[in-house]
Amino acid sequence: MMALIPLKVPAGFYRNGTDLDAAGRWRDGSLVRWRDGSLRPIGGWQARKNGFSAEPTRGMHSWEANDGTAWLAGGSHTELSVMTGSNTVHDVAPSDLATGRADAEVETGYGYGFYGTSFYGQPRPDYGNYSEATTWSLDNWGEYLVACNTDDGRLLEWQLNTGTNAAVIANAPTSNSSLIVTEERFIFALGSGGNPRKISWCDRENNTLWTAAATNEAGDIELQTSGQIMLATRTKGQTLILTDVDAHTARYQGPPYVYGFERVGTSCGAISRRCAADVDVGVFWMGQRGFYMFDGNSVNELPCEVHDYVFSDMNTAQQSKIWAFNNGQFGEVWWLYCSGDSLEIDRYVAFDYK
């Protein structure tokens, strides 16, 4: 009998190039991870709550109130839902919340394009431009929930009273694309006032004061970028701001300028408004054609051995739905996305950062 020869196959899948290029590597698989050099199932999951929202959720946030109550918030294109630790769900969206879109849509409706183009009575051509699926940015201002969705554009606050809907923050700018609460307790309104490059912030610890004066720390700035602001996240004592083309940081420096802004990366823009995850080693995100990490100082592109598989079979029309999350127990970042023929999320790609 011939002796058994141990196979030492490196961890991770390889899907770049041909099958021959992947010789000696794992080629395909799903819902597995490597631990201590061995391939194992991820372990499964279970539903926490059925019927959390009537529509697909495009943004979630969990936090704890001052009394220890656990809360989970999530938003769809029609709802803003909150749930207690006991699984009781309440819709706290304002009654006049702007109706958004469950899916990205081709921009061919009234008002799209320049006046006088194309022929009267003829169908408008599809130029490949899409209105994004509605997504939410959610955060907590102390124990209160603050929220903004891409179609409504107002900054909302919910003060933990399930009998009262979220209310518009007084004096805050409108037509915003998203928000973030900084480590220093300022609210950043991103895409402020409909300007895709503008950031406005309230006075410190006062989210109803937005007009800059010598006696407060409110302010605004227009980023020097050729792109539009997509998202922001807290990391390592600063705020990372991602546009669709580059990356910037905001660092608190006190009056008179309050914040200092610096571009820290180029050609590394975010593919969606939910594509970044902050972990202890930095921020990871998906770009248009790759994956990136900010370590607190600089941006680096991540080597990806499944790059061709992911980006060659993705429904880019629905890329606004791409969602990242941190699976901290296993030191992983996951990205959920739509495959080429799918209107809804049906695939994932995961990166082990430990």
What residue spans do the PLM features occupy?
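N-terminal beta-propeller domains
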Residues: 1-119, 157, 176-249, 336-353
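Beta-sheet-dominated scaffold domains
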Residues: 4-6, 11, 138, 186, ...
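Surface loop/turn motifs at the tips and blade-to-blade linkers of beta-strand repeat domains
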Residues: 50-55, 168-172, 221-225, 263-268, ...
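Short coil turn/linker residues within repeat-based beta-strand modules
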Residues: 87, 152, 162-163, 206, ...
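Beta-propeller fold detector
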Residues: 90-100, 166-171, 212-214, 259-264, ...
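Beta-sandwich interaction modules
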Residues: 121-141
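Asp-box/WD-like beta-propeller blade repeats and closely related beta-sheet repeat scaffolds
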Residues: 131, 160-181
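Hydrophobic or amphipathic alpha-helical targeting/insertion segments
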Residues: 140-168
